Amino acid sequence: MDNRTLFEMRSIVKAFSGVRALDGVSLAVRPGECVGLCGENGAGKSTLMKVLSGVYPYGTYEGEILWDGAPLRAHSVRDSEHAGIVIIHQELMLVQQLSVAENIFLGNEITKPGGRMDYDAMHRKAEELLARLRLTDVNVAAPVMNYGSGHQQLFEIAKALAKNARLLILDEPTSSLSAKEIEVLLSIIEDLKRGGVACVYISHKLDEVKRVCDTITVIRDGKHIGTRPAAELDINGIITMMVGREMTSLFPKVEHTVGDVVLEARNVTCWDVTNPNRKRVDDVSFSVRRGEILGVAGLVGAGRTEMVSALFGAYPGRSSAQVLVEGKPVKVHSPAQAIAHGICLVPEDRKRHGIVPLMGVGENITLATLAQYARGLRVDKGAELMTVDREIKRLRIKTASPALSIASLSGGNQQKAVLTKMVLACPKVLILDEPTRGVDVGSKYDIYQMIADLAASGVAIIMVSSELPEILGMSDRVLVIGEGELRGDFANQGLTQERILAAAIHAEPRLRAA
């Protein structure tokens, strides 16, 4: 690795309405080095990256930025990109209807004399860039929409390389990727490092940070906590720096008793929304007991989300199932019916299905239980506010006011609010679909504690997760779904990630717990 400093931020201060979002943060990166930037949601990572990438222009912050030893005064994103600094956002910025090549060169087109676009040159160059990323089977003239999220993430990197990126900022790059796609991406980042490209890697997945990063910088509450070689830190050490307190285990151990069967699902079947002849879930049956945490594992696209959506009456296509609650058959054709029978769901995509962005934090929290505060034709705002204040304190939801728009909260705090909303409905069965996706480690712990406490109180938990450590750390029993079928039903005693993956890909026969 080149020992000279490519990029350095010195004592950066950024304030909004007098409140410091960044308070003297420093960061340095060498050519071919990958620096992990860690911190809880709201710590200041996004603000720092906006300063770094030119979103917040020179003059709107205090401190100094050096590029190749000289002051860098970027007044726009284009200025930063011209210097060689490119950010790849968590939400991919590709135009789905345009071709792969058109996306790679969008805003950076190769033209012929006279100004017309040189498609032949762009296609050739796009193929060369993708070959650097081990993609040799891509039709660069085809629309981006023809390719999955794993390919699209690499198209974004190719787009950055087309701009001669020397510093690549990757913001939660694996949040929507499968385990196999993550392996490919991390190995490609290693290739880029060997080629001299520097990276800033932002992720809540600390195992990835440890694996791909050379050094780790932690910020907390807008302050620089420290920078250490990755080899000197274990995951618990990173967490301690991030949250400011020692956490001996991410997964809380709360004594709970598993009781009688509270929900039984028989022959759950879901047909594809666009192809009614294809089944997304095929004849899956299972049960969950009072006080039990049932983990549901499987590869991306296995049908887990479709299955739990059908149990909640929210699957958009055709579905069928026999559902029994406490031994009695119930009809669940809508979320309202499900909630009435004590079945609640915290959805996978909280931004689309979990929150109402324009409403306040408090309004979102009481949305499912508003009838409890009805006094004739009016709402008892005093009683509602008492509930909201109690829950905000209990779950440590960071908000300046319950009236503040929920869209202004970090992902972790939004998720806590969505969870609280459903818990207030007093569920017998609580279904959690990817409950900690995009959530920082401190909020994860709070959510895990809430799940464990709910199980201890007798609530049956069904937890869908793509994070196997989460499944193994929280579950009493694990279902494995593969290609819409039940591939395994395991007691979580001596269970390993390898065994779960083997069942998910059909590498061993269908198994059930003894």
Curated annotation (Swiss-Prot):
GO terms for MF: ABC-type D-xylose transporter activity; ATP binding; ATP hydrolysis activity
Gene3D superfamilies: P-loop containing nucleotide triphosphate hydrolases
UniProt-annotated location(s): Cell inner membrane
Entry-linked SMART domains: AAA
GO cellular component: plasma membrane
Enzyme Commission (EC) number: 7.5.2.10
Reaction(s) catalysed (UniProt annotation): D-xylose(out) + ATP + H2O = D-xylose(in) + ADP + phosphate + H(+)
Group of enzyme by EC: translocase
Keywords per UniProt: ATP-binding, Cell inner membrane, Cell membrane, Membrane, Nucleotide-binding, Plasmid, Repeat, Sugar transport, Translocase, Transport
Disulfide bonds: none
Membrane topology of this protein: Peripheral membrane protein
Residues reported to bind ATP: G39, E40, N41, G42, A43, G44, K45, S46
Residues annotated as domain ABC transporter: 7-246, 263-508
Pfam families: ABC_tran
NCBIfam families xref list: PRK13549.1, xylG
Subunit structure: The complex is composed of two ATP-binding proteins (XylG), two transmembrane proteins (XylH) and a solute-binding protein (XylF).
PANTHER family: CARBOHYDRATE TRANSPORT ATP-BINDING PROTEIN MG119-RELATED, XYLOSE IMPORT ATP-BINDING PROTEIN XYLG
Entry's family note: Belongs to the ABC transporter superfamily. Xylose importer (TC 3.A.1.2.4) family.
Function: Part of the ABC transporter complex XylFGH involved in xylose import. Responsible for energy coupling to the transport system.
Protein name: Xylose import ATP-binding protein XylG
Gene: xylG
